[in-house]
């Protein structure tokens, strides 16, 4: 319901205005003061000895940051660089922090997105509630670059390159701060970053257009790959920032979806609640982010759909050149 207020001009927004506006103003004041304290030196920030690239956004919810992080890691790896990824590890509870992921780390330890990034890229991935602590851990691994998954507003960590990922269809909603609107920072922040990435929709001036390109569906148990359109009676579910985006992708791929179910972002699934979805169809299809949480109890009729960030060739080269220049 809150997203309908933020993005769809729902009438409840007007009814709740007297309650939400003061909270929104307080959020803005705290966020602005916190940023000012770090920029003025009143609060100390950490400067890494390794170039730091921040991939974040100014709105709450999923905008497609993780595919951008994966793309950056893979591109830099292809140039021979060793890359580390720092994350807050939301949704996980590690035995200690900072925590360096291994090939066997599970989402309940580190959170779902760090596991996805580790599995896709084999990069060094570290998590800590204070991102600068994760960065320090990665420095010890001898990485050439550190990319932070989210953390644009974590001003306790200095950075060399900043990306803002924008949902090209929903944009910035009603342009109010949380909780009246989706903003973590004001739209004026857009003018101060190195790259604005527009995920879907129509990119605007000074924005780099990005598309999430789906590949074949992959079976969670066997690893078999099949085209989505060849799968029948699919039940689709997603526990991501904006589930309708996943369902729309399936529709574009002409998937035979008979039921959809959205869950909150970073949800820790119980086997029974996923198994119950099977009553609506013959097979399940989910996002890659959800698959890392369901892998341990997956059934042979469960599939996931990986997506890859794609950019115009010229823009992709500009992005890489800018990052590599920092190192040189």
UniProtKB/Swiss-Prot annotation:
Q: Look up the record and name the pathway of this protein.
A: Glycolipid biosynthesis; lipid IV(A) biosynthesis; lipid IV(A) from (3R)-3-hydroxytetradecanoyl-[acyl-carrier-protein] and UDP-N-acetyl-alpha-D-glucosamine: step 6/6
Q: What EC number is given for this enzyme?
A: 2.7.1.130
Q: Which InterPro entries is this protein grouped with?
A: LpxK, P-loop_NTPase
**Keyword Nucleotide-binding included in the entry's annotation:** yes
Q: Which SUPFAM superfamilies match?
A: P-loop containing nucleoside triphosphate hydrolases
The Gene Ontology CC terms held by the record are: plasma membrane
GO MF annotation: an example: tetraacyldisaccharide 4'-kinase activity
Quickly give the catalysed reaction: a lipid A disaccharide + ATP = a lipid IVA + ADP + H(+)
Q: Which UniProt key words apply to this protein?
A: ATP-binding, Kinase, Lipid A biosynthesis, Lipid biosynthesis, Lipid metabolism, Nucleotide-binding, Transferase
Question: Which sites bind ATP?
Answer: 59-66
Q: Name one GO biological process term.
A: lipid A biosynthetic process
NCBIfam families, from UniProt?
Answer: lpxK
| Family affiliation | Belongs to the LpxK family.
Protein role: Transfers the gamma-phosphate of ATP to the 4'-position of a tetraacyldisaccharide 1-phosphate intermediate (termed DS-1-P) to form tetraacyldisaccharide 1,4'-bis-phosphate (lipid IVA).
Spell out the protein name for this chain: Tetraacyldisaccharide 4'-kinase
Q: Which organism is it from?
A: Aliivibrio fischeri (strain ATCC 700601 / ES114)
- The gene is lpxK
